[in-house]
Amino acid sequence: MSHAVKIYDTCIGCTQCVRACPLDVLEMVPWDGCKAAQIASSPRTEDCVGCKRCETACPTDFLSIRVYLGDETTRSMGLAY
């Protein structure tokens, strides 16, 4: 089952989520929106197993990265009709 990985613009570019992911789903890409000049990206979401280690590793109080498991994806992201 595929899971959606959403990275919010509150990301501080710390790389904690990238290092926590056991399947290398995430990577850092250039971004001018924070001091670190980088943001997490999820180019390989098809490999995500939904362990949410990236969420646990995120040091921001508002979880800059979220994993939405299967059916909760559209509902949680506000895409359901």
Swiss-Prot record:
Where primarily located?
membrane
Q: Looking at the UniProt record for this protein, which Gene Ontology cellular component terms does it annotate, in alphabetical order?
A: photosystem I; plasma membrane-derived thylakoid membrane
Print the keywords alphabetically: 4Fe-4S, Electron transport, Iron, Iron-sulfur, Membrane, Metal-binding, Oxidoreductase, Photosynthesis, Photosystem I, Repeat, Thylakoid, Transport
Extract the Gene3D superfamilies matched here. 3.30.70.20
Give yes or no: UniProt keyword Endoplasmic reticulum.
Answer: no
Which InterPro entries did the record assign?
A: 4Fe4S_Fe-S-bd, 4Fe4S_Fe_S_CS, PSI_iron-sulfur_center, PSI_PsaC
| Cofactor(s) needed | [4Fe-4S] cluster
Q: Where is the 4Fe-4S ferredoxin-type domain?
A: 2-31, 39-68
Look up keyword Transmembrane helix and say if it applies. Answer: no
Membrane topology per record: Peripheral membrane protein
Q: Where in the cell is it found?
A: Cellular thylakoid membrane
Bound how, and how many: what does the cofactor note say? Binds 2 [4Fe-4S] clusters. Cluster 2 is most probably the spectroscopically characterized electron acceptor FA and cluster 1 is most probably FB.
What processes in GO biological process is this protein linked to?
A: photosynthetic electron transport in photosystem I
Q: Which GO terms describe its molecular function?
A: 4 iron, 4 sulfur cluster binding; electron transfer activity; metal ion binding; oxidoreductase activity
Query: What is the top EC class of this enzyme, as a single word?
Result: oxidoreductase
Quote the catalytic activity from the record.
reduced [plastocyanin] + hnu + oxidized [2Fe-2S]-[ferredoxin] = oxidized [plastocyanin] + reduced [2Fe-2S]-[ferredoxin]
Q: Detail which positions bind [4Fe-4S] cluster 2.
A: 21, 48, 51, 54
UniProt EC number = 1.97.1.12
Recorded hits in PANTHER family, A to Z, give: PHOTOSYSTEM I IRON-SULFUR CENTER (PTHR24960:SF79), PHOTOSYSTEM I IRON-SULFUR CENTER-RELATED (PTHR24960)
* Quaternary structure (record): The cyanobacterial PSI reaction center is composed of one copy each of PsaA,B,C,D,E,F,I,J,K,L,M and X, and forms trimeric complexes.
User: NCBIfam families annotated for this entry?
Assistant: PS_I_psaC (TIGR03048)
Q: Which HAMAP family match?
A: PSI_PsaC
Task: Supply the name of the protein.
Answer: Photosystem I iron-sulfur center
Organism listed in the record: Prochlorococcus marinus (strain MIT 9211)
Q: Specify the taxonomic lineage.
A: Bacteria, Bacillati, Cyanobacteriota, Cyanophyceae, Synechococcales
